[in-house]
Amino acid sequence: MLGRARKGYCAAVTRRIIGLLRASHFGPNLLVTILSYFFAQLYWWEGPAFVIAVGVFCGQLVVGWSNDLIDYKDDLLHNRQVKPLVSGEISVPLLQNCLRVILPIAILINLFGPLGFIGGGLSVFAIGWAVAYNFYFKFTIFSWLPFAVAFGSLPSCMALSKGQMPTLWMWLGGALVGTAAHFLNVIKDMEQDKASGIKGLPQRFGSKASLVSAFVLIATAVALLLLTFESLPSATP
């Protein structure tokens, strides 16, 4: 009897952990975290780079969890069972409590970690922009702006942590990739978003134009990276 209860408890905890990871939009979260580790290694050795990546991961948890909480009613309306809150894998109070815990952790790691107050401040600034998308920008023609700012800040905060001025390719390349990610992310729910009154730039463009825009933006970002490849920094202790 005790063994069954223990197994049931472990299964419930595991289900909640998986639900929390899914609510963070784990795929994109992991991708951004890996990219941050890559950029951090251009300036730092592996130890500090790992801490920087952890800070970015925590920031992505803030963004993803706040997004699912804000979108909960709309997700219910459209019966999006892929969302853990709608499927019942996790509850709203649980996600709210986790968000309250992770927010100060994300701020502290970014500000007091290897990024320092300047680089870490930019990272926290980017988190703020990403959360602002959930509250306001997603409904406007400037829905792309938080993505451009957040992705543009990702490599730039690494340079600032070493007292270096971020180069143009960091800001522009990151902004292009971020805007492309926004267009691609919206396509799958575009019609439901329109029905809910969400009128960001991709919704105004439509699916086909958004897909073409994303391709052009990514191609431009890749071309920019290739043109500036020799200017990539090398890690220093």
Where are these regions (language model features)?
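Multi-pass alpha-helical membrane architecture of UbiA-family
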Residues: 2-237
